[in-house]
């Protein structure tokens, strides 16, 4: 946009030119927006001749309209000091003056040529007016106006005045309150190699004219000097170039590896086709046929039944886990609604582990059959190129046999790290809900997988022949066990990581799964993590037996034991506080006795001194000191009393809470007993709830009104009398049922799987939570 300058905007007297203590009164820096982020502004400018640099000037301005420091440095031609050393001194002076300032500093430079000469740290924000003006496409008339204005002012006389006036003009015409000061990188500066010398010699602050070749050589020589001597305070340009080259090489290596991986399956398929053609042309002899691998073993009907049993067991286990999650949601949030979709605030990262029955020819794995394991490790570049494969094969098997393979691509191993043994640990130790959610999800995956394997086995039985050797027991078959995973040792020689799940194969020749992490039933890694046992057997029979031996009641009992341990800890804490209160009360009593004795002695001494020596100043001074000591002790005793009172109040609150919990438990027991034992018949009518009482009374009144309408005799007191009669008909007394067999006299009620047996809002855990909140306060 075009704009004109008024003479009233920039009028400087001789006094203002020389004094530089303040800026023009009409100029105001913005105290809002991005300018308010900075505490000081440094304006740096260089003046040039056709062949060299003439001078350097910089000023430091405070946002309170004050000039803190001004410097004008001339490059004298008489001295033999080289240009690079002179520039090093100037940069050192600017850095020293910036170090004295507090807060963030904004460095302004009116020309793009000045910025390569500055060697400032990365913490300083450098801003170039000329680049921003060109990006905003400001018309050239404005530059011409700047040139004419500063040319007429004869800026060579006073350099301080030029910088201040420049800053005022630029902030008035270009900078707004919401203007963003972009960070500047010296590498992005592109100084043109060819340029004209015309119009550059007027000491113009703003120029869009080409730079002379001599000045280009000076600037480039100074940058080379900084690089060679490693004097750059910013990140060196050579290091950035090296990093870019390394990244380019890494990308090329990754592309080559991917191409090799794509070529490998094609080569395998070609080799297989050649072998098939050779077998057709040259049939194998009797010896070769005996050595070759036999067809896969036929699966017996007992094994199919075992698989069906296993699927049923997994489904039942999933249901029980859903119930436990439902109960845990009640315990943690009794007031909230039960929503199975809520897992938690944090979701840990996961590793994809493949452990499926796949043919060797099928290289594409579906995500539905993948088992995800928890892992909270950041991806590293070292493991991106590694490919982990662990195979359990038999040399006597055919290509159609099911082989236990675990493969992972580059993207799947990107999340692995050296700390791979920590997979069994849940990231948030207290997040039991998420742990149960993960177990349920893994169970669903296993159930799907078992069902698929059942279908494939049944199909294979129909296709295979009956006359098959029984010597093929070494073929691997997957027998999954849920809820736990382990990772084998890392092969340091090949720089590859072997990732396997804890699903044991049937073959006894497999030695890779010997170091599995096993957790027995009822044990816990942490206080709040519930685990389920692993199956480490290598035979199918032992596998199925161990799976069937898991009892759901034991799992429930483990959860109750964990809750009981938490409550026991709270009781121990309560006893500890009681002991502390008793000790403090005893100490308080002893201190009070000492205080009384000291106070009585001092009082007697004061009386004696007043009778004997009324005018003795020394005794009065001693008495004053003793009174001050007494007052100090009184204050200490009062503070201790207040502490004891606070602790007693907390004790009373705890006792009241315990009584409320007991009463609520008793009420729950009585209510449950009444609801379970409702007697029917004329003698013992059913219990009528409060909601039904109003409806029954209304129905009775309506029936009475109908009778009265039929008889045409309306009695206003008739309905009231009938209500009174019904209220007088009380329930006959009956003996309470013997609840000794129903309720077990223990601290905790046995948990049923039905929804009615779930804990209510006012339970032990809710009171326990309130108890913990009182301690936090």
From Swiss-Prot:
Biological processes annotated in GO: regulation of DNA-templated transcription
List keywords of the entry alphabetically: Coiled coil
Superkingdom is Eukaryota
Biased composition, class Low complexity, residue ranges: 263-273, 383-400, 459-476, 484-516, 688-711
Bias (Polar residues): 712-729
Q: Which InterPro entries match?
A: Disconnected-like (IPR040436)
Taking the record's annotation, the residue ranges forming a coiled coil are 237-271, 629-678
- UniProt key word Coiled coil: yes
Annotated region described as Disordered, given as residue ranges: 263-303, 357-400, 454-516, 656-741
- Specify whether Zinc is a keyword of the entry: no
The record's GO CC annotations read:
nucleus
- Ranges of Basic and acidic residues composition bias in the record: 357-380, 661-678
Q: What is this protein called?
A: Putative uncharacterized protein DDB_G0289041
């Amino acid at each position: 946009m075009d704009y004109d300058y008024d003479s009233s905007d920039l009028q400087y007297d001789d006094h203002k030119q020389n004094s530089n203590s303040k800026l023009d009164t009409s100029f105001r820096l913005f105290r809002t927006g991005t300018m308010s982020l900075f505490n000081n502004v440094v304006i740096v400018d260089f003046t040039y001749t056709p062949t060299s640099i003439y001078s350097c000037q910089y000023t430091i301005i405070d946002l309170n309209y004050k000039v803190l420091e001004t410097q004008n440095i001339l490059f004298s031609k008489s001295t033999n000091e080289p240009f690079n050393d002179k520039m090093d001194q100037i940069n050192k002076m600017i850095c020293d003056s910036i170090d004295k300032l507090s807060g963030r500093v904004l460095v302004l430079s009116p020309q793009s040529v000045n910025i390569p000469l500055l060697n400032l740290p990365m913490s300083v924000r450098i801003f170039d007016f000329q680049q921003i003006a060109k990006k905003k496409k400001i018309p050239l008339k404005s530059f011409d106006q700047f040139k004419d204005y500063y040319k007429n002012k004869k800026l060579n006389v006073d350099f301080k005045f030029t910088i201040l006036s420049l800053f005022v003009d630029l902030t008035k015409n270009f900078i707004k309150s919401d203007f963003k000061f972009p960070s500047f990188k010296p590498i992005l500066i592109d100084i043109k190699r060819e340029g004209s010398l015309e119009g550059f010699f007027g000491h113009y602050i703003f120029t869009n004219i080409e730079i002379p070749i001599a000045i280009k050589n000076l600037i480039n020589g100074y940058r080379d000097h900084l690089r060679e001597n490693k004097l750059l305070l910013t990140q060196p340009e050579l290091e950035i170039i090296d990093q870019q080259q390394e990244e380019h090489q890494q990308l090329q290596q990754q592309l080559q590896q991917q191409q090799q991986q794509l070529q490998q399956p094609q080569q395998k398929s070609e080799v297989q086709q050649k072998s098939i053609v050779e077998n057709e042309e040259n049939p194998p002899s009797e010896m070769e046929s005996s050595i070759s691998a036999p067809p896969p073993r036929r699966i017996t009907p007992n094994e199919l039944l075992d698989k069906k049993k296993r699927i049923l067991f997994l489904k039942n286990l999933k249901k029980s886990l859903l119930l436990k999650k439902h109960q845990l949601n009640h315990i943690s949030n009794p007031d909230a609604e039960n929503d199975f979709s809520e897992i938690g605030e944090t979701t840990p990262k996961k590793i994809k582990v493949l452990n499926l029955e796949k043919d060797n020819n099928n290289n594409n794995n579906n995500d539905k059959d993948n088992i995800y394991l928890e892992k909270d490790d950041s991806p590293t570049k070292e493991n991106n190129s590694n490919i982990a494969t662990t195979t359990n094969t038999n040399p006597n098997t055919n290509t159609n046999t099911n082989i236990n393979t675990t493969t992972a691509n580059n993207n799947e191993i990107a999340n692995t790290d050296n700390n791979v043994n920590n997979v069994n640990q849940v990231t948030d130790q207290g997040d039991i809900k998420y742990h149960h959610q993960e177990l349920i999800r893994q169970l669903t995956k296993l159930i799907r997988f078992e069902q698929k394997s059942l279908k494939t086995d049944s199909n294979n039985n129909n296709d295979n022949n009956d006359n098959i050797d029984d010597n093929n027991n070494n073929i691997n078959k997957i027998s999954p066990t849920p809820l736990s995973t382990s990772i084998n040792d890392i092969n340091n020689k090949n720089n590859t990581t072997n990732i396997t799940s804890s699903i044991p194969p049937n073959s006894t020749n497999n030695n890779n799964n010997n170091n599995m992490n096993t957790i027995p039933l009822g044990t816990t890694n942490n206080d709040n993590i519930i685990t389920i046992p692993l199956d480490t057997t290598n035979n199918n029979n032992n596998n199925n037996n161990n799976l069937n031996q898991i009892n759901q009641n034991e799992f429930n009992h483990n959860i109750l034991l964990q809750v009981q341990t938490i409550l026991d800890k709270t009781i121990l804490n309560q006893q500890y506080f009681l002991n502390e209160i008793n000790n403090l009360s005893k100490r308080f009593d002893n201190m009070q006795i000492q205080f009384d004795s000291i106070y009585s002695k001092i009082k007697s001494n004061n009386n004696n001194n007043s009778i004997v020596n009324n005018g003795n100043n020394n005794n009065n001074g001693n008495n004053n000191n003793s009174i001050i000591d007494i007052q100090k002790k009184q204050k200490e005793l009062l503070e201790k009393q207040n502490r004891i009172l606070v602790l007693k109040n907390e004790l009373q609150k705890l006792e009241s809470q315990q009584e409320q919990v007991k009463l609520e438990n008793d009420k729950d027991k009585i209510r449950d007993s009444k609801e379970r034992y409702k007697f029917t018949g004329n003698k013992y009518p059913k219990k009528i709830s409060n909601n039904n009482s109003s409806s029954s009374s209304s129905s009775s009144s309506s029936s009475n009104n109908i009778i009265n309408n039929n008889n045409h005799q309306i009695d206003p007191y008739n309905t009231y009398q009938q209500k009174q009669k019904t209220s007088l008909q009380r329930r006959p007394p009956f003996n309470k049922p013997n609840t000794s067999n129903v309720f077990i006299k223990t601290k905790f009620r046995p948990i049923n799987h039905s929804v009615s047996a779930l804990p209510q809002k006012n339970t032990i855990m809710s009171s326990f939570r309130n108890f913990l909140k009182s301690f936090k306060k």
